[in-house]
From Swiss-Prot:
Localization: Parasitophorous vacuole
Main subcellular localisation: other
Keyword presence, Repeat: yes
Chain residue ranges for the region called Disordered: 1-76
Biased composition (Basic and acidic residues): 1-68
Described purpose of this protein according to its UniProt entry: S antigens are soluble heat-stable proteins present in the sera of some infected individuals.
One Gene Ontology term, aspect cellular component: symbiont-containing vacuole
Signal peptide coordinates: none
Keyword annotations: Malaria, Repeat
Protein name: S-antigen protein
């Protein structure tokens, strides 16, 4: 029930606004302020709390509740 390819809004292949392939403002290829190379606080290389390598709660490798590998509740 935490499918990484969910059609929700937080999976990596999601058509939502937070996936890496998303056209939203949080994907790694986004021109927004939350991509992995961004100096913001949500990219995977960021020191923030939402990147996949972060200790936060939204990255795919996070122990939080929104990443595709998470034990959370958003990928369904």
């Amino acid at each position: 029930e935490f499918r990484p390819n969910s059609d929700g809004d937080k999976g990596p292949n999601s058509d939502g606004d937070k996936g890496p392939n998303s056209d939203g403002d949080k994907g790694p290829n986004s021109d927004g302020d939350k991509g992995p190379n961004s100096d913001g606080d949500k990219g995977p290389n960021s020191d923030g709390d939402k990147g996949p390598n972060s200790d936060g709660d939204k990255g795919p490798n996070s122990d939080g509740d929104k990443g595709p590998n998470s034990d959370g509740d958003t990928e369904f």
